[in-house]
Amino acid sequence: MAHKKGVGSSRNGRDSNPKYLGVKIFGGQAIEAGNIIVRQRGTQFHPGTGVGLGRDHTLFALVDGKVEFSVKGAKKRRTVSIVSADA
């Protein structure tokens, strides 16, 4: 009979850092050029007028104005646009 207890190793004990994804500025809110609108993996939201697409699919404002979310096309794509504040 063994005098020492067999010691196993756990297969858990890992966790990834939070990525802080999601919509940062919602529809109708004012935004300045350069501000991030959506952080995402892939294009869940597509860029519309006045919105740029970053290398990691982040959507950001190219102009000042108000954020507007809409669903367009037969594929029902969710697009994000900037409507100028003076319009």
Curated annotation (Swiss-Prot):
GO terms for molecular function: structural constituent of ribosome. Pfam families: Ribosomal_L27 (PF01016). SUPFAM superfamilies: Ribosomal L27 protein-like (SSF110324). GO terms for biological process: translation. PROSITE patterns: RIBOSOMAL_L27. Keywords: Ribonucleoprotein, Ribosomal protein. GO terms for cellular component: cytosolic large ribosomal subunit. Belongs to the bacterial ribosomal protein bL27 family. PANTHER family: LARGE RIBOSOMAL SUBUNIT PROTEIN BL27M, RIBOSOMAL PROTEIN L27. NCBIfam families: L27. This is Large ribosomal subunit protein bL27. It comes from Stenotrophomonas maltophilia (strain K279a). The gene is rpmA.
